[in-house]
């Protein structure tokens, strides 16, 4: 297997620390809201990596944490008049439900930050004892100047972190790049039960120390792969390396670093101010199948930016329809026997830096072969291989009958679209526009194509 290692900046062969047990850590969600599709992209990509590693090696320990203590969580709890557990329990449950709908496997371990506070405190004390952290007014800071290799992941020079004389250094810091390991409790923390006793007083951990502590707790000082979104590369992952390597001299923390690219919506970064934050829950509740969302997320290479726009779903729907249509043409039982093998071409694509779009293109080549051949045995064999291989990628999870089952609402929508088409043909543009507006009021958006056909999707 070959993967692109952010740490070295090149694709390199994957050489495990121990071939009998591959160790992987991935940064999971911060549970203050429903997970958005950018978060979901990361979860789905590393789900495929997990599946691949399980295929290639006898044992894989996959740890994906949950950040359940954070400023954003505290803000939501305060606004809602709840404690942090009341907030996080709702969104942890929702996260699990949403990821199940995207056909994601459960990780081996899914630790919560609040269950590992003592591990964090012990790690912080180690850093203080080794001269890599200092206490100022009940706040513990990491001293970036104590770690000469700081910046190795993000390729930043520590001097770049000096912002200039016009920007004040945060109170208590010795260097602008120093970051918080432990912060003292506020009145709000006490009220919301978001603080714990420590040698430095009542308080709560900084974000970065959480992942260092949980990865150490479940994977030890060194492990094979650390994954996450490109937005976490700096400062989060850079700080993780610094903390962990300083707490355990001689360690290197993670051997391979994998980062998935950014996801935008209609060419723009998702943000509350733009009102374009798109959650998995919104898509599912609007009628978009989880398998369709997963297909879109896998159809762009994980390191490339992915722009989510309305026609993306239309195109993905057509692609999956093509696959299910091919399966519907095979008039035999397609239940899988144990001897049905995965497509080696697809596995090879995944072994080449998790190339999921190329793997999907191989699936479509198989569909073409199914459609071309009239040999029943060959068609059946190809169909079974297609199902087995697609299932490995987490798609084609339905029977073709279930996939194409149309509900009454869909039939009504298609009927209105047909009426609109006739109205346009008769130059009755007012009626056509009235139908468009009626559908829009029901959350149905129409997209007219150059060939005269019309696609629709739920916004």
UniProtKB/Swiss-Prot annotation:
Binding site for ATP: 272
Keywords (A to Z) from UniProt: Aminoacyl-tRNA synthetase, ATP-binding, Cytoplasm, Ligase, Metal-binding, Nucleotide-binding, Protein biosynthesis, Zinc
Motif 'HIGH' region, chain ranges: 29-39
Signal peptide residue numbers: none
Reaction(s) catalysed (UniProt annotation): tRNA(Cys) + L-cysteine + ATP = L-cysteinyl-tRNA(Cys) + AMP + diphosphate
GO MF: ATP binding; cysteine-tRNA ligase activity; zinc ion binding
Keyword Iron: no
Positions of disulphide bridges: none
Any one Gene Ontology BP term: cysteinyl-tRNA aminoacylation
One GO location term (cellular component): cytosol
Cofactor(s), by name: Zn(2+)
EC number per UniProt: 6.1.1.16
SMART domains according to UniProt: DALR_2
Subcellular location: Cytoplasm
Motif stretch ('KMSKS' region): 269-273
Cofactor binding note from Swiss-Prot or TrEMBL: Binds 1 zinc ion per subunit.
Source organism superkingdom: Bacteria
Binding site for Zn(2+): 27, 211, 236, 240
PANTHER family the UniProt entry points to: CYSTEINE--TRNA LIGASE, CYTOPLASMIC, CYSTEINYL-TRNA SYNTHETASE
Binding partners and assembly: Monomer.
Similarity-based family: Belongs to the class-I aminoacyl-tRNA synthetase family.
Name this polypeptide is given: Cysteine--tRNA ligase
Source organism of this protein record: Ehrlichia canis (strain Jake)
Gene symbol of the encoding locus: cysS
């Amino acid at each position: 297997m070959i993967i692109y290692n952010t740490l070295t900046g090149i694709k390199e062969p994957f050489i495990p620390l121990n071939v009998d047990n591959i160790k992987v850590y991935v940064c999971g969600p911060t549970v203050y809201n429903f997970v958005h599709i950018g978060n979901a992209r990361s979860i789905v990509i590393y789900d495929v990596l997990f599946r691949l590693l399980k295929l290639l090696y006898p044992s894989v320990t996959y740890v994906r944490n949950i950040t359940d203590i954070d400023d954003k969580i505290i803000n939501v709890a305060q606004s809602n008049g709840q404690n942090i557990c009341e907030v996080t329990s709702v969104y942890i449950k929702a996260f699990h439900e949403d990821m199940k709908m995207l056909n994601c496997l459960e990780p081996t371990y899914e630790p919560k930050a609040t269950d590992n506070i003592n591990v964090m405190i012990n790690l912080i004390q180690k850093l203080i004892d080794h001269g890599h952290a200092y206490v100022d007014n009940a706040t513990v800071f990491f001293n970036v100047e104590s770690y000469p290799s700081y910046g190795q992941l993000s390729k930043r020079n520590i001097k770049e972190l000096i912002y200039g004389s016009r920007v004040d250094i945060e109170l208590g810091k010795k260097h602008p790049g120093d970051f918080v390991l432990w912060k003292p409790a506020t009145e709000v923390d006490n009220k919301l039960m978001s603080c714990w006793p420590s040698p430095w007083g009542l308080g709560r951990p900084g974000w970065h120390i959480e992942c260092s502590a949980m990865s150490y707790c479940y994977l030890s000082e060194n492990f094979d792969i650390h994954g996450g979104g490109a937005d976490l590369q700096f400062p989060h992952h850079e700080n993780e390396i610094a903390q962990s390597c300083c707490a355990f001299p001689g360690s290197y923390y993670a051997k391979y670093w994998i980062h998935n690219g950014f996801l935008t919506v209609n060419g723009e970064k998702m943000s509350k101010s733009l009102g374009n934050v798109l959650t998995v829950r919104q898509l599912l509740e609007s009628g978009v199948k989880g398998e369709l969302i997963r297909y879109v997320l896998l159809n762009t290479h994980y390191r490339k930016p992915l722009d989510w726009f309305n026609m993306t779903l239309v195109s993905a729907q057509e692609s999956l329809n093509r696959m299910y249509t091919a399966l519907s043409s095979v008039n035999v039982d397609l239940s899988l026997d144990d001897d049905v093998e995965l497509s080696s071409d697809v596995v090879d694509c995944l072994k080449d830096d998790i190339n999921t779009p190329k793997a999907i293109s191989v699936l479509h080549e198989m569909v073409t072969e199914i459609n071309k051949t009239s040999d029943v045995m060959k068609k059946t064999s190809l169909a079974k291989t297609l199902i087995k291989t697609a299932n490995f990628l987490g798609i084609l999870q339905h029977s073709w009958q279930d996939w194409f089952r149309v509900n009454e609402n869909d039939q009504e929508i298609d009927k209105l679209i047909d009426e609109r088409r006739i109205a346009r043909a008769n130059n009755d543009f007012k009626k056509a526009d009235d139908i468009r507006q009626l559908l829009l009021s029901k959350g149905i958006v129409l997209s007219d194509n150059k060939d005269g056909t019309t696609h629709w999707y739920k916004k």
